[in-house]
């Protein structure tokens, strides 16, 4: 979808937002329980075009403090999936400061050497972007 989107929006007179809305419409028509998103521009677009659609903020948005949670809440995100790197005390502080939003945390799984959403190794070595779900786990290779 991303490659087609870029190719289509390079054409003269094509507006990126209109193309993104057209691409998103069939997804919304399926009536998903929620969309997991991390791009502020796309979140804004979905909020305007489909205000009732539930949005969960992806862990790849790297939300690490209560101020960031409040920002995302103000723009209409319904649930925040917090960064994997947070301690239990940090999660508790966020909950205390932001009692009115759903929070989700990972309790098991891979923990990258970089902060969630900030690793560039896979993209650099293999042209596969971790933020698009295709991380090659370059940080776990046996380097010599």
Task: Mark where each language-model region is.
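As written
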Residues: 76-77
